[in-house]
Amino acid sequence: MFLKNKNIIYTCVISFLLILICVLAKADDENRNHRLIISEYLSNNKEFASSFIQYSNVSFQEGKFFLKKNRLRIEYTAPTQIVFVIKDSNAMYYNIDLKEVEYFNPKNTVAKIFFDFFYNEKFLEDIILNNEEGSFSFIKKIKIKDEINNINIIFEKSPVKLRKIEITNSEGLTSFTIVNADYNPNLDDKIFSLANPLLN
C-alpha cells in the first residue's frame, strides 16, 4: 500500500514537473519570438522622427525625437526649448532659451538608455516580457552611477510600433509617449551635428 501511494505521488510530481517544463519552454519561446520582433523592428527603422509627450513629477513636456546614423536628437519644444544630440561616447545639451551649451558623456546618464535601446544589440538579452491583448512590453533593470533604473518599453502589437518608454528611479517615474511616428523622414544630417550652435 505504501509503495502504491509512493508511486502515485512520484507520478504526480513527474507530471507536474513535465507540465511546468512545457509552460516554461512556451514562455521562453514567446520571449525569444518577441525579442526577434523587436530586433527586426529596430533594424528596419534606423531612421525615423516622432513627437513625444514626457510626463515626470506631475509636469508635462512636449518635444520631437529624431534617429539616424547612430545618433539621436531630442528636442523639447514646450514649455522650455532644449536640444540634446547624442552619440555613443559624446552628447550635447543646448538650452535655446538660456543660450547655454554643455557637452557630456552619455554613458553615465539616462541618455545611455535611449542610445542602447536603439543601437546596442545586447540590450534585449535580459528583458522580462509582459504580453497583453493589444500590446506587449518588456522590463529591464539598468544600473547608472550606482542607481537602479527600471525600464518599461511598450509596443503596440499589430502592426508593431513603439508606443511608450517608462523609466523609474529614485526621482520617480518619467514616461515618454511616442506620437505621430514617421519612418521615412529623410532627415538632414546637419541636425545631428555636435558642433556648438552658438558659434554658427
What spans do the regions from the language model cover?
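Short hydrophobic/aromatic-rich beta-strand segments that constitute the beta-sheet cores
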Residues: 50-52, 72-76, 91-94, 138, ...
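An acidic-aromatic
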Residues: 64-112, 174
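Bacterial N-terminal signal peptides that target proteins for export
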Residues: 2-13
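Short, solvent-exposed helix-to-loop capping segments enriched in aromatics
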Residues: 109-122
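Boundary at the C-terminal end of the N-terminal hydrophobic targeting segment
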Residues: 25-29
